[in-house]
Regions:
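Glycine- and aromatic-enriched membrane alpha-helices
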Residues: 1-425
Length: 425
């Protein structure tokens, strides 16, 4: 059996697994820097704690629900419950141990609900968020991932998603938007400044996210070769032009280039190329990343303000909108010259755009309806939102009993006392 393993492909997938794992704590830094100082630890904790919870969920039932034998195109069966039989299985197409594939996919499952947390920063209690994220992963992410990657009905319709533009970014972004609207806006939103408290932390998080994204996209080739190389290059190009596109529009609109804008533009470009990285040419990636940054900027800087919803850290504005554009762009620029197992987009004489648009409609509907139902179920048993006093004090102290900065003393009750605990930031 050992002789059947492609050691090069296996090493590549294991390396990319480590890179993708690194993305979740870096997402925590990216979000943490954008949060107010009284909420930074709570924001980081919402992402970091999910590494533990969702990893266990995925190993026990998530993997089999996604990649188990298909049941009517809807969900996988329980044939792989608890990874049954995977210990000695080698995937026939890539000749890697199934355990390596499981580890890689586990990192995707972990980061998806963590992205969603950016929509509710500063106002959702920790325990209900964890319960909601766990249920969301089981009943929303797992079915959607099966529909796309596990032999479900969307893949049968011909929809393509190379590394998670639909299953990860659109799903988490739209669910985040739904969740933030159900929770309501932060108190004082629109009336007092709610500025990022630590932009160096955000730019560091964005930079390391970029590094990890090479594993995210190129690792989805599940082996070394032309496809992985193309994914690395398209990822780099799209992120690079994303920075340029966002900052240019920002200068036109607001008159000054910002560090936050550069970080947001880079991430927008990364999100936009995610579904397309293994299907489009590097030249197409330039267009995809540039337009992706522009549409994300419009969503974050203009549409959100006009509609008045409080997507705290723009999970929908960047991931939902960027993923939507990326899925459409795949339907336009995908070519079998890059990936013979893919399909030709509209600009190459193919009919891929139709399945891509249909899959987007289904993803949006499923995310909105599913998130609404799960929110109502969890809120029937738990208070989802922090109290007025706790929100004013900050979730770091009220939910976790600690503060990120200027710690001075703890009372016997364990409540943290800090000189800056009433800061607006």
């Amino acid at each position: 059996m050992v002789n059947m393993i492609d050691t090069g492909n296996t090493a590549w997938v294991l390396l990319c697994t480590a890179l993708v794992f690194f993305m979740t704590p870096c997402l925590a830094l990216f979000y943490g820097g954008m949060a107010r100082s009284k909420n930074v630890l709570g924001t980081i904790m919402q992402s970091f704690f999910l590494i533990g919870v969702i990893s266990v969920e995925f190993i026990l039932i998530g993997y089999t629900l996604i990649f188990g034998d298909d049941l009517h195109g809807i969900i996988g069966d329980f044939s792989k419950f608890g990874l049954g039989g995977a210990e000695t299985t080698i995937l026939s197409d890539t000749h890697i141990p199934e355990l390596a594939f499981i580890a890689f996919q586990c990192m995707f499952a972990v980061i998806t609900p963590a992205i969603m947390s950016g929509s509710v920063t500063g106002r959702m209690r920790f325990a209900p968020f964890v319960v909601f994220a766990l249920l969301w992963s089981i009943f929303i992410y797992n079915p959607m991932a099966h529909w796309i990657w596990g032999g479900g009905f969307l893949s049968d319709l011909g929809a393509l998603d190379f590394a998670g533009g639909l299953a990860i970014h659109v799903l988490s972004g739209v669910s985040g938007l739904t969740l933030c609207m159900l929770l309501g806006r932060r108190r004082g939103y629109g009336r007092m400044p709610m500025l990022p408290h630590h932009l160096p932390m955000t730019i560091l998080g964005a930079a390391i996210l970029w590094f990890g994204w090479f594993g995210f996209n190129a690792g989805s080739a599940l082996g070394v070769g032309f496809l992985a190389a193309n994914a690395v290059l398209t990822t780099q190009i799209s992120a690079a032009v994303g920075i340029v596109g966002w900052v240019l529009v920002e200068m036109i609109h607001r008159g000054k280039p910002t560090v936050l804008g550069a970080a947001s533009g880079g991430v927008s470009g990364l999100v936009a190329i995610t579904p397309a990285a293994g299907f489009v040419t590097p030249m197409a990636a330039i267009i995809i990343g540039f337009i992706g940054a522009i549409v994300c900027y419009l969503a974050v800087a203009i549409i959100k303000n006009r509609l008045g919803y409080d997507d705290s850290l723009d999970a929908f504005g960047i991931h939902g909108v960027g993923g939507t554009w990326g899925a459409i762009a795949t339907g336009l620029w995908a070519t079998t010259t890059i990936n013979p197992d893919g399909a030709n987009g509209l600009f190459y004489g193919g009919s891929l755009l139709g399945p891509q648009l249909l899959s987007l409609v289904i993803a949006y509907l499923f995310a909105v309806v599913g998130t609404f139902i799960l929110f109502k179920i969890v809120s029937a048993f738990m208070d989802m939102r922090v109290s007025i006093g706790s929100e004013s004090l900050g979730i770091d102290i009220s939910e976790h009993g600690e503060g990120a900065y200027n710690q001075s003393e703890f009372k016997s009750s364990g409540r943290f006392i800090s000189s800056n605990q009433t800061s607006l930031l």
